[in-house]
């Protein structure tokens, strides 16, 4: 799998950005961004979503010129508005993107495309899904409230299809709950009690945690299954419209398609072929997978997302989080992977060690550390990498540091309590 890279400076809360590796942030199979509120986590995830979509649009438009410079950067800025990033651009903003077959660059008011390799035959068109933090919209079904924000609307449409796909039932990693569509064609959460009794709750009345993870897991699983099993039958209809492609302009005089801001005609047969071509992989971009969830459930949801990402070789999972539990469990996934490898080296024929490891951390979710990058955003506008090549979390990690501060606070208060008790004993003689 190729590692997509971006370099960002002076964009929203991002100032200097990442200062190692020539400033390029790497996106392997799994990338996670942590850090305090307003430090740029979602800025990076929204930006990579936009850039990957632009690469896909350029591929569908059959762009093959040595270079395409668009003097007006409105294409890029218009797309950024989809994620409400329009106000993040500054006069000194610098953005570079290195994808599978295309490089993109934004400087000043100029947006340029360059070939990354000799050809793009290896490019696998992705289905890109952005899971916004504001995804607990299931009560809308009951209240018939509109979904207006573009990311939410896109997720809502996929969720409707996912519900139908999993109508017979879908297990949720919360206390044995299960999603299903009942005989009355109502979407419900089924809870089986210890005595065998069954309780059903309409999804719109379910807990905030269930409303947060149900769209996330159903849509993630549904998209990957469609790509992995039925790709021939599920063409990428979202790319088929010329109107949706920012690199295509229809001549008002002749009604012919041209590359935007140029006099070069679009190769129509190639455009139609690529537009109808099925997606070959899934890029799943998730804001705050831990939202409204108890720590054990946070870990269960992460492991489910990791397992889904492993269903196809070229799937990618990009996460932003505030949760130390999500960070620590992602690191634990690399330890589990190394233990599985050691079990193979031991020739664990009976599977004793593998069974014990699997009980602790399922093999389906275990990740090679080389397939993971973990970054931390800071209030000063910088980005640092916080997991080493062996899968170990660095002590400087912000969330790790906060956990240590909490432990130190308790130690300090226990010491004060002990001192006060000793003082009380001395007074009472």
Predicted feature locations:
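P-loop NTPase switch/coupling surface
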Residues: 1-186, 272, 311-314, 327-328, ...
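Walker A/P-loop NTP-binding motif
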Residues: 48-54, 219-223, 306-308
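Extended helical coiled-coil dimerization/tether regions that scaffold
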Residues: 98, 105, 129, 133-279
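Loop/turn-to-beta-strand initiation segments
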Residues: 281, 313-318
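Walker B catalytic acidic pair
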Residues: 287-289
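Conserved D-loop-proximal element of ABC-family nucleotide-binding domains
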Residues: 294-295
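Conserved hydrophobic alpha-helix in the ABC-type ATPase nucleotide-binding domain
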Residues: 300-305
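Conserved H-loop
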Residues: 321-325
